[in-house]
Amino acid sequence: MSYNTFGHIFRVTTWGESHGPALGATVDGCPPGVAIEAEAIQHWLDRRKPGQNRFTTQRQEPDAVRILSGTFEGRSTGTPIQLMIENTDQRSKDYGEIARSFRPGHADIAYHWKYGLRDYRGGGRSSARETAARVAAGGVARAALAALVPGLRIEGYMVQIGPHAIDRARFDADEIERNPFWCPDSDTAALWADYLDGLRKAHDSVGAIVEVRASGVPAGLGAPIYGKLDSDLAAAMMTINAVKGVEIGEGMAAACLTGSANADEIRMGPEGPEFLTNHAGGILGGISTGQDVVVRFAVKPTSSILTPRRSVTTDGCEVEVVTKGRHDPCVGIRAVPVGEAMMACVLLDHLLLDRGQTGGLRGTIG
């Protein structure tokens, strides 16, 4: 199996399976001298780990990260950083009944067609368990960004679960860390809680939309045509399990706007040009403008549910499949820190690319 690595200069290779002994990431291209401690990476992993509330899978994994290489006396050496997370709460017996059946909505049948075999225990490599390694790598990227661009901030939050979207007029950033949904609207968070409780009782699941915003991003990251910042961000978000669509800025809604409404006007401010709006999501022509970079991605409903569904076996027999085990009623909840991690990795990669190409040179206005 190839294609386990992403990035250009800051490169991340993830490895491991859901029910294997461990999983992790090899991070290459981190600049030397960056302060990197396991405790700091653990902070980001703790935001993603399962079993923290009734709205996520009850699999109990501490997700304790170990740094095996690439640091000395708490700082990066410039050599590959190896991160490892042990799996401690696998229940492979939960999947014995589907060893020869394909779960509808899962990668099972596609893996079987491509490779001729598959790890049926929790999806193996296709499990969202793999994203723990991405969050660990994102912790390294955040540390490097903090050293190189001190004012840069990345924050993700849920904006919709099922048909229920937040009220943007009630957006409160302080609310994001106060509820299990990373929701910036307390009223909607309460609605989501009742909604998900009902779905859990009905043995069903639902999709969601996550928004990730990066502020303090320097202007000039990205490149025209094939090196666009937004194309790399979209590709990164699409690699997250269950993601089925990505928007930058106004996204699909831009198709409903007129040119006069969508184009972000510019005026001269005390410190230079200022945009009056941000429909572009902080990126024009594939290059960052200095405004907030705004990305949204849609996550499909969890495919593992207790409702019987029709499928087939490896022998070609028709069967009904009930997916046992411990699963999230809405995988979008734990996708929030994963989206943040992917944003961090892509921004650091483009920052290093830009420094290599332009040396930080910038055009001036005024």
From Swiss-Prot:
<keyword id="KW-0274">FAD</keyword>
<comment type="function">
    <text>This reaction introduces a second double bond into the aromatic ring system.</text>
</comment>
<keyword id="KW-0285">Flavoprotein</keyword>
<dbReference type="GO" id="GO:0005829">
    <property type="term" value="C:cytosol"/>
</dbReference>
<comment type="pathway">
    <text>Metabolic intermediate biosynthesis; chorismate biosynthesis; chorismate from D-erythrose 4-phosphate and phosphoenolpyruvate: step 7/7.</text>
</comment>
<keyword id="KW-0288">FMN</keyword>
<comment type="subunit">
    <text>Homotetramer.</text>
</comment>
<keyword id="KW-0057">Aromatic amino acid biosynthesis</keyword>
<protein>
    <recommendedName>
        <fullName>Chorismate synthase</fullName>
        <ecNumber>4.2.3.5</ecNumber>
    </recommendedName>
</protein>
<feature type="binding site">
    <location>
        <begin position="300"/>
        <end position="304"/>
    </location>
    <ligand>
        <name>FMN</name>
    </ligand>
</feature>
<dbReference type="InterPro" id="IPR035904">
    <property type="entry name" value="Chorismate_synth_AroC_sf"/>
</dbReference>
<feature type="binding site">
    <location>
        <position position="285"/>
    </location>
    <ligand>
        <name>FMN</name>
    </ligand>
</feature>
<keyword id="KW-0521">NADP</keyword>
<dbReference type="GO" id="GO:0010181">
    <property type="term" value="F:FMN binding"/>
</dbReference>
<feature type="binding site">
    <location>
        <position position="326"/>
    </location>
    <ligand>
        <name>FMN</name>
    </ligand>
</feature>
<feature type="binding site">
    <location>
        <begin position="241"/>
        <end position="242"/>
    </location>
    <ligand>
        <name>FMN</name>
    </ligand>
</feature>
<dbReference type="GO" id="GO:0009423">
    <property type="term" value="P:chorismate biosynthetic process"/>
</dbReference>
<keyword id="KW-0456">Lyase</keyword>
<dbReference type="GO" id="GO:0004107">
    <property type="term" value="F:chorismate synthase activity"/>
</dbReference>
<dbReference type="InterPro" id="IPR000453">
    <property type="entry name" value="Chorismate_synth"/>
</dbReference>
<feature type="binding site">
    <location>
        <position position="48"/>
    </location>
    <ligand>
        <name>NADP(+)</name>
    </ligand>
</feature>
<keyword id="KW-0028">Amino-acid biosynthesis</keyword>
<dbReference type="GO" id="GO:0008652">
    <property type="term" value="P:amino acid biosynthetic process"/>
</dbReference>
<dbReference type="InterPro" id="IPR020541">
    <property type="entry name" value="Chorismate_synthase_CS"/>
</dbReference>
<dbReference type="GO" id="GO:0009073">
    <property type="term" value="P:aromatic amino acid family biosynthetic process"/>
</dbReference>
<feature type="binding site">
    <location>
        <begin position="125"/>
        <end position="127"/>
    </location>
    <ligand>
        <name>FMN</name>
    </ligand>
</feature>
<feature type="binding site">
    <location>
        <position position="54"/>
    </location>
    <ligand>
        <name>NADP(+)</name>
    </ligand>
</feature>
<dbReference type="Pfam" id="PF01264">
    <property type="entry name" value="Chorismate_synt"/>
</dbReference>
<comment type="similarity">
    <text>Belongs to the chorismate synthase family.</text>
</comment>
